[in-house]
Amino acid sequence: METAVQHLINHGIRPSVQRVAIMHYLMEHFTHPTVDTIYRDLLPEIPTLSRTTVYNTLQLLQEHNAVWALSIDKRNVHYDGNLKPHAHFLCRECGQVFDIEIDDHLKSHLHSYPGVKVEKVELNYFGLCPNCKAKQVESQN
């Protein structure tokens, strides 16, 4: 598995303490965090970290295709360190964003356009996550 430092270098980004910590966080947390979530979680580890540094680092990572910025939620931008083909699901009740695997047929279709290089595909599903669906069923009974 590629380390955060290797990932940064492979995408042409000079590693720094903050960049490595943010990239490592995204590689370890598949929760599609926002700037505020990353800032809150890393602040105890890096007391000098600022929200602006997190935002600017994420912008840099996105510009170098080291992470994806998801505009699945109208209120927040979520960040994804998983660059393998997959879809996303947004729960309309709790706001949780999680990965959904896509089948091999769709994956093979992504590479079937001659002369183009597909760099990113956004496939988003919206609805209720299992927890919110269960709560809805309980409230109806």
Predicted regions and their residues:
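Short, Lys/Arg-enriched N-terminal segment that forms or immediately precedes the first helix
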Residues: 1-12
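Short helix-coil-helix linker/hinge
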Residues: 15-17
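Pre-recognition alpha-helix immediately N-terminal to the DNA-recognition helix
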Residues: 20-25
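Short capping segments at the starts of secondary-structure elements
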Residues: 29-34
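DNA-recognition alpha helix
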Residues: 37-46
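Basic amphipathic alpha-helical segments that dock to polyanions
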Residues: 54-64
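Non-DNA-binding regulatory cores of transcription-related proteins
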Residues: 63-141
